[in-house]
Amino acid sequence: MVMLDTLANAMAAIKNAEMRGKGEAIIMPSSKLIANVLRILEKEGYIGGFEYIDDGRWGKFRVKLLGRINDIGVVKPRTPVSYRELAKMPEHLRKYLASRDVGLLILSTPQGVMTHREALKRKIGGIVIAYVY
């Protein structure tokens, strides 16, 4: 079986484990992008922590869940947004968040993976890859 979008599989694994009330989720295969997204989720308080497990193949992440995630997923198609668009928060981005100040959009920017709030502070745009609330 071919995995086309490992980030989408990781977000689905987290969402399914949260809905089932599990204390942890196993994400495989691992990647740098998934690690960066997990760091953001940990920093913002959505997950308790994560660890990398080297299994000799692709590696895995064990994610400790806190029960704070209501919805999580990837944004398809991955659309680029400029700083001006991000400041206005157009309708095609607003639909991924629960309300005005609830939730995060995760962007891939030239300065690394960050939340939409960090991108607004740094006045840069990027590609919207995921959302969480």
Swiss-Prot record:
Q: What InterPro entries does the record point to?
A: Ribosomal_uS8 (IPR000630), Ribosomal_uS8_CS (IPR047863), Ribosomal_uS8_sf (IPR035987)
| Domain of life (superkingdom) | Archaea
Q: Which GO terms describe its cellular component?
A: ribonucleoprotein complex; ribosome
Question: Does the keyword section mention Ribonucleoprotein?
Answer: yes
What GO terms describe the biological role, i.e. biological process, of this protein? translation
Q: Which UniProt keywords apply?
A: Ribonucleoprotein, Ribosomal protein, RNA-binding, rRNA-binding
Q: Which PANTHER family match?
A: 40S RIBOSOMAL PROTEIN S15A
State the function annotated in the UniProt record.
One of the primary rRNA binding proteins, it binds directly to 16S rRNA central domain where it helps coordinate assembly of the platform of the 30S subunit.
Question: What is stated as this protein's family in its record?
Answer: Belongs to the universal ribosomal protein uS8 family.
Name the UniProt record assigns to this protein: Small ribosomal subunit protein uS8
Name the source organism.
Aeropyrum pernix (strain ATCC 700893 / DSM 11879 / JCM 9820 / NBRC 100138 / K1)
The organism's lineage is: Archaea, Thermoproteota, Thermoprotei, Desulfurococcales, Desulfurococcaceae
Gene (UniProt): rps8
